[in-house]
Amino acid sequence: MARYNHAAVEKKWQEFWEKNPINPKDEKKEKYYCLDMFPYPSGSGLHVGHWRGYVISDAWSRYQVIKGKYVIHPMGWDAFGLPAENYAIKMGIHPSITTKKNVENIKRQLQQINAIYDWDMEVNTTDPKFYKWTQWIFVKMFEKGLAYEKEFPINWCPSCKTGLANEEVVDGKCERCGTAVTKKNLRQWMLKITEYADRLLDDLQELDWPEKVKKMQAEWIGRSYGAEVDFALEGREDKITVFTTRPDTLYGATFLVLAPEHPMVQKICTDAQREKVEAYISMAANKSNVERMAVNDKDKTGEFTGAYAINPLNGEKCAIWISDYVLADHGTGAIMCVPAHDARDFAFAKKFDLPIVQVISKDGKEEVLEEAYTEASGIMINSGEWNGRESSELKVEAANEVEKRGFGRKTVSFKLRDWVFSRQRYWGEPIPIVHCEKCGNVAVPVEELPLKLPEVENYEPTGTGESPLAGITDWVNCTCPKCGSPAKRETNTMPQWAGSSWYFLRYVDNHDDKALVSREKADKYLPVDMYIGGVEHAVLHLLYSRFWTKFLYDIGVVGFKEPFVKLFNQGMILGQNGIKMSKSMGNVVSPDDLVRDYGCDALRLYELFVGPPELDAEWDDRGIDGVYRFLNRFYNLVEESKDKNISPTKEMIRVRHNLIHDIQLRFDSFNLNTVVSGFMEYNNSLLDLAKKEGGVDLETLRSFSVLLAPFAPHIAEECYHLAKGEGSVFAAGWPEYDDKAMEADEIKLPLQVNGKVKAVLEVPKDLSKEEILAKAKECLGDKLDGTLVKEVYIPGKIVNFVVK
């Protein structure tokens, strides 16, 4: 078998497409916007794992082109933020230089994929023409009260030397570098994402997204219905408010636990307990929220404040404790503890010998509890006028009763916290705020944007809580835009998520200097129809971009509320033994050599063939050999058939229509690995027919080439033209199948004797029952020894003879 010259074929058609674009802008066509999550310009470049998502999105984009749509398929660079800056620090080269070099390298590698990216739409988050509009969005949020300044303990990465949002802490560690996160009290800029919590949660049901991602976002937002209950303090006029989802258990609340940072702790702490309490507060301050929440129930710690609250229903005293498993920014920062019906409270009460009062029972009788009774329903006991009631029914009524009696109110609580938006680093968008002693915080006027990031010699993080920008006095010192008095610029920068929260809008209008996107183009080309990328940013980028889109909808910039109609998350490509590919592990597979040895088409196909696209898969270099053999076999089939003028037989037509049906069904279902295996299976069928008939008809070969084109575009274009196709394979239109043409003239029937298959009979499908039974007996011969008791024929399925 001759090997096709992949290098020559790819060069030939890339030059052809350069002169004859397959996806020219055409306003008359229906638009389809297919988008990759744009990459960080990493210094290590792309490996075969990165290729997977880009090949999937390009195959899907080319599919839409063949179906007659104008496809928006852009690419850009998420170049601000920690990944780029940390690499620059490691190399000892300014991030502006390393970023530019890395972009050039990755762009070269992306072009090896030969995806149909529209490079005229290219964006880079570090371009002042781009981040002018990132700053503009921040200013608009500031004007609407959604951006505000606050000093409080935040997640702090000692290695990256910057604050982190809650979403950037994974298992108590920095999601970028893996360092254990601590707490640091800092002045921060916040974005009030909590204002959008209900909408972010409710609108998930409108999205054609993987259920896994929607569930992750729903749990992160964490909406809970319940009541806020006010507990008066013994001997004081103050009160402490708690949030509970189970107001029906209020009679069983025997103690309160406050977050160590709760503002009432210092106020209510007795002199006798103060030293222990303050020591505990200091200890808790060094833990991240994730660490605090991860402690097992039996290992939880705490200190008694010496103060008591009064249960508003029964007047009983409730000791007030502090513990680091209660977080100041969750709910009210205080919880009422019902140890009889909460496993965590039960363990805490047992450890510190606190009272346990059962208020719900399965049968209405009190029992000695060895563990908390946590069933969703039961009969109320020890609950005054609520005794005998069903707890699940009382749950809603209890909230109403709390509100009616004046010591609480029905409310909704969220786990979602406001977004910590500032970073104490250099390589990011400057926050366009001026601090004036007279006017307070003042936004830089929009006509003065972009506020450009100044050049610095020392860009390494300071670790002091101030960014390197704080040391550039000529830049920091300015005049207030409002009153003209001396003022100082904000020196923190935006996080790496800022530009990525809206970049998908800019692609379609990337040269507009009057708007981040014109409303005309937003209405015409947006939102994104298909978004493809990893699941790792489910509660980061994907949540933030939804928030920003809703805000831009509210102020009239866009006419849609959700950025991405459909989302697909590809799995990771792993190295040998299922280990994640990384330079440090030495298991990175570069695509460069594979493209040289096998060609772009073979690598594209193997990226899809390696396994179900939504699942992780282990890379095996040997697998690409099989894909390459398939391409050679198909190429040779076309080469050998092209001049023979083979007339299509019924079987060729049947195979062709089944091929079209099966590939389309698998493609539309995103079963891309089975698409590739389908190509191999049907190619084998055609090779068998070619041996029998001397070749394959050109229409079947052209249809095969069109189906193959989204996946292996170069060889598909070559084979399409060898099969006498006109124009480009991408202008041929997606072939259609005919259900009737898919039916075979003959059927294969398993022949059974006493329920055991003895042979398979191939007969014309229109034979009568009598004819089929006669042929079946003839086929079985002496296998039918004995007395024939019964003949069974299930039409088109099976023949069975019962003999004795």
Task: Walk through the language-model features, giving the residues of each.
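Helix-rich, typically C-terminal accessory recognition domains appended to large enzymatic cores
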Residues: 78, 143-158, 223, 410-439, ...
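Residue patterns forming the tRNA-binding/recognition surfaces of aminoacyl-tRNA synthetases
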Residues: 3, 11-12, 16-20, 90-240, ...
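Catalytic alpha/beta core of large soluble enzyme barrels
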Residues: 57, 70, 262-363, 368, ...
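Alpha-helical recognition segments enriched in aromatics with Gly/Pro capping
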Residues: 307-330, 359, 476-613
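Amphipathic alpha-helical
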Residues: 194, 199-222, 259, 263-303, ...
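Conserved oxyanion/phosphate-binding beta-strand-loop segments in alpha/beta enzyme cores
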Residues: 1-35, 65-74, 98-105, 209, ...
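N-terminal catalytic cores of NTP/NDP-binding nucleotidyl/phosphoryl-transfer enzymes
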Residues: 26-93, 99, 122-137, 160, ...
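Basic, alpha-helical terminal appendages of large translation-related enzymes
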Residues: 1-20, 24-31, 259-262, 272-274, ...
